[in-house]
Amino acid sequence: MRFFALFIYRPVATILIAAAITLCGILGFRLLPVAPLPQVDFPVIMVRASLPGASPETMASSVATPLERSLGRIAGVNEMTSSSSLGSTRIILEFNFDRDINGAARDVQAAINAAQSLLPSGMPSRPTYRKANPSDAPIMILTLTSDSWSQGELYDFASTQLAQTIAQIDGVGDVDVGGSSLPAVRIGLNPQALFNQGVSLDEVRKAIDSANVRRPQGAIEDNVHRWQIQTNDELKTAAEYQPLIIHYKNGAAVRLDDVASVTDSVQDVRNAGMTNAKPAILLMIRKLPETNIIQTVDSIRAKLPELQAMIPAAIDLQIAQDRSPTIRASLQEVEETLAISVALVILVVFLFLRSGRATLIPAVAVPVSLISTFAAMYLCGFSLNNLSLMALTIATGFVVDDAIVVLENITRHLEAGMKPLQAALQGTQEVGFTVISMSLSLVAVFLPLLLMGGLPGRLLREFAVTLSVAIGISLVVSLTLTPMMCGWMLKSSKPRTQPRKRGVGRLLVALQQSYGTSLKWVLNHTRLVGVVFLGTIALNIWLYIAIPKTFFPEQDTGVLMGGIQADQSISFQAMRGKLQDFMKIIRDDPAVNNVTGFTGGSRVNSGMMFITLKPRGERKESAQQIIDRLRVKLTKEPGARLFLMAVQDIRIGGRQANASYQYTLLSDSLAALREWEPKIRKALSALPQLADINSDHQDNGAEMNLIYDRDTMSRLGIDVQAANSLLNNAFGQRQISTIYQPMNQYKVVMEVDPRYSQDISALEKMFVINHDGKAIPLSYFAQWRPANAPLSVNHQGLSAASTIAFNLPTGTSLSQATEAINRTMTQLGVPPTVRGSFAGTAQVFQQTMNSQLILIMAAIATVYIVLGILYESYVHPLTILSTLPSAGVGALLALELFNAPFSLIALIGIMLLIGIVKKNAIMMVDFALEAQRSGGLTPEQAIFQACLLRFRPIMMTTLAAMFGALPLVLSGGDGSELRQPLGITIVGGLVMSQLLTLYTTPVVYLFFDRLRLRFSRKNSKPVVEI
């Protein structure tokens, strides 16, 4: 009593305190960062290593395996995967959430250093690492185009100057430059000319390497001066290499341009990048794990004027893709939804109270509670994201509930003729315990979420804390500011025998009378209501089992990512044509705004594309509908497939797959994996629950096996090293020397001129100089035959791995897809030597599925414990929790009606319903118990009177919560995929709960009361007189 009086009778102090915490909230709002979702990035580090010309199997055994053994000893590694392709190895390390990325990076560098002695000596550089996840879509893509600069020159400028500058921006994890390679002097050898001159390829290599030397020469000095010695020991351009003498024949000099073409070109000619229909260099920028995407993009944009100033006029720099506009638009939509929710909730209060003054009180309580929450969010290190703003939107209905309960009870006393300050004090005193019970039991729902581990726990933590803080502040406001305003703003009124005869008042009276009549009938037919109650429990179980489930709603971020997979024996020239064909098909779609793509490098038969769609308001179709439409056209391209997927704000795992979900096959036997992977992939491709099936297991690449006749080689004076060196010099794009320039270092690349290596006959022109100086053709000591070979070798841990990626057809849920895969694996009878498991998002979905029921039961148990403590009873909490089955049925039926799968967002809705719908029962039970204690009423009379007396606040609080969530259901535009499941669940649950709990709660109350009396009689003992 004294606590409430302290604030009621000191209005100035109360107002100033409320104003102070509101100002703190406004300041917190201005300081809060903006993000699409809470930070849930796993710390990921990518290690790269290269050995030009090495086969995938060589890279896997000699480079990947030593690095994996060393990196696998690092503490906190959650998963390690590797992919080795032609001349390149990439290892992805995914760490636990609690691992600091910078500390992990130091351990990675130490592990690389430890493995260095085990790596091949011919590697041109040490392995490097980047603190970025290569499977994440770039947060921004910049393109460079020019009509006068070559692709190599553009690439050099981009990698030497732009990429270096961008990489230094806070939040940037990696800048991947694609579309070409660094400039180089390329030497294209003529095998026939070399044979005629008697010059071996190794002799050419050694001559070039010896002619381009960068060594210190020292200095000369006397008593007065000092002279630095400088020589012309370096060759920097093709023109300087052309007259280089590499051999003498019969006293005549054989120069390099006599036996080769020497050109200024690029290190790897098998690279191509495009933006729309124009050749381009791409700068793909990825953020560091656990950094804010909006802040990073803003920092890059702030740097763009400086970058533009660095760029020559002949180069055009454009932003081809930016993830931030759709994120900002989505957050703006949520903010508008929040504003609409506040307005609707206040409108509900006004319609019930029909008083401007009375409505002003909750109209003040709502913004004070919500705005003050921003201060707590800032102190907790949260961000303004879709989930935290959705929490505030839902909180609108909660925070007004407490104020409504207090206000309605005070209004009831005022209508009875009590003085305002007395009514405020007594009304607050009467419902204070009720309000505290409702708020604490609602906050208790979120305790299991706060204790939940893994990615789902981290994802939902901000939502739970934000909502809990808003409810806590609302509780304080409703017991301090609300009664104070009631006491000083509202006036006493004479008792009304027929109150509210107009509009909503008449409707409410009619509803209350109808409810009273129907409640009497229900209380006389309790068995029928009991059957209905038990039926809702059974229906909950059936609906939960039957409803399709997924991990997270499929988002439309306005960005698509595509992976090209062509025939494994395709040439680079043909692959570049496929890229152009696919880009044209996509560019012609009316919903597409921009297309960029690249191909080449170590994976000749693959490519990547990034597609920016028009803003949501300028297109009718969703991203998934656009993918479905394009899929039909893309399948008509012969010899290649383009797999499209919508970029999501949550991307789990480090695998760079061509679809949204992955299923990984592991085996310690590579032969077993190669035998079973095609069978499993074929069986999965026949499933209607899966689409876009593809695999990173590629072992049908064209290979030419050379079989050396070692006896003949020994007789001819040739060793294996010389033969292998010949092949590397001829066909490996071998980097034989380095050109040092002020801004960068460039390579001299040697190979047989492509004009002489267009078919297998090129091998017949190869020869080796033996120990006697004679030219021995390769065909003298080697035979060759075509065969199949892997284009890539993949590991997970230290096991051979193959990942099958898949998308979901429209109308199919992730649960249906995973069930179909598990069923197929069982039917195939896959041996124990081949193990299958879901990866990435599908793996987290499986883990979440296993814990969902446990989480719901934990929330119910927590609420029961809190209510049991508050009521000092084992029975009354059960009465209150009896409202939950009807809410669950309503939520699940609403999801089915809207064809929405049960996702993590829907789970949040169910958890919220556990907290919301019990409020009705709390108000009924509180007043019934008080009526029994102080009024001497029977349980039947007490619960009947409580139901009628609390009918108006029950309707007000339920409608307020319902209208607070309704904008989420009706919202469209960016980000609506996230908001709608939450709104659907809450509104559906509230509608069904309101229809049933007004009748089932009194019946359950009487059932437990009779049960209590029955047990008390059994336990009572007769008194014996002595």
Curated annotation (Swiss-Prot):
<keyword id="KW-1003">Cell membrane</keyword>
<comment type="similarity">
    <text>Belongs to the resistance-nodulation-cell division (RND) (TC 2.A.6) family. MdtC subfamily.</text>
</comment>
<feature type="transmembrane region" description="Helical">
    <location>
        <begin position="853"/>
        <end position="873"/>
    </location>
</feature>
<dbReference type="InterPro" id="IPR027463">
    <property type="entry name" value="AcrB_DN_DC_subdom"/>
</dbReference>
<feature type="transmembrane region" description="Helical">
    <location>
        <begin position="387"/>
        <end position="407"/>
    </location>
</feature>
<feature type="transmembrane region" description="Helical">
    <location>
        <begin position="897"/>
        <end position="917"/>
    </location>
</feature>
<keyword id="KW-0997">Cell inner membrane</keyword>
<keyword id="KW-0812">Transmembrane</keyword>
<feature type="transmembrane region" description="Helical">
    <location>
        <begin position="431"/>
        <end position="451"/>
    </location>
</feature>
<protein>
    <recommendedName>
        <fullName>Multidrug resistance protein MdtC</fullName>
    </recommendedName>
</protein>
<comment type="subunit">
    <text>Part of a tripartite efflux system composed of MdtA, MdtB and MdtC. MdtC forms a heteromultimer with MdtB.</text>
</comment>
<feature type="transmembrane region" description="Helical">
    <location>
        <begin position="984"/>
        <end position="1004"/>
    </location>
</feature>
<feature type="transmembrane region" description="Helical">
    <location>
        <begin position="360"/>
        <end position="380"/>
    </location>
</feature>
<keyword id="KW-0472">Membrane</keyword>
<feature type="transmembrane region" description="Helical">
    <location>
        <begin position="953"/>
        <end position="973"/>
    </location>
</feature>
<dbReference type="GO" id="GO:0005886">
    <property type="term" value="C:plasma membrane"/>
</dbReference>
<feature type="transmembrane region" description="Helical">
    <location>
        <begin position="333"/>
        <end position="353"/>
    </location>
</feature>
<keyword id="KW-1133">Transmembrane helix</keyword>
<keyword id="KW-0813">Transport</keyword>
<feature type="transmembrane region" description="Helical">
    <location>
        <begin position="15"/>
        <end position="35"/>
    </location>
</feature>
<feature type="transmembrane region" description="Helical">
    <location>
        <begin position="463"/>
        <end position="483"/>
    </location>
</feature>
<dbReference type="InterPro" id="IPR001036">
    <property type="entry name" value="Acrflvin-R"/>
</dbReference>
<feature type="transmembrane region" description="Helical">
    <location>
        <begin position="528"/>
        <end position="548"/>
    </location>
</feature>
<dbReference type="Pfam" id="PF00873">
    <property type="entry name" value="ACR_tran"/>
</dbReference>
<dbReference type="InterPro" id="IPR023931">
    <property type="entry name" value="Multidrug-R_MdtC"/>
</dbReference>
<dbReference type="GO" id="GO:0042910">
    <property type="term" value="F:xenobiotic transmembrane transporter activity"/>
</dbReference>
